[in-house]
Amino acid sequence: MNYKDFLNELDKKLQEYFEFHKEHINCTIGCSSCCENGDYPLSAIELEYLMQGFMILNSKDKITVQNNIKNIVKGGACPFLIDKKCSVYQYRPIICRVHGLAYLCKDNTVKVPYCAKNGKNYAKAYTDGEITINPIKENLDTTVLLKDFDYGEIRNLIDWINH
């Protein structure tokens, strides 16, 4: 299976997970709080695919992204965010695809999206650092999902850009 086919299968699975937890998911078009401050870790294979998305952007959006890259700071907005929307949505990394879901990690801890603390996803089921519903039982960590690929090194987006 190639990477694009893998992403298509992953997206189908994630769609089912989002549907299963829909009463706890408050993601909406235009809500980009998850993209406005972070480190955005991604693997080499994800970066390569992301850049394919960049290459097909129109000239205006390419210039916007390039300007955003010049101004990128650690913990800042994703440079691919334009007008509160992902300019490379179909090419986004796995961390962006799974963000918003609460899932079980290999050490049996639950990964809860940070927006739960801000009154968004899972906010009604998340109190004092504890989640009161059953999380997705699959570990959705990038390294686990990409285990069948030679995915290369994982770095934060800013580190890939400054490399």
Which residues are covered by each model-predicted region?
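Short loop/turn segments that flank or connect secondary-structure elements
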Residues: M1-S33, N37-H163
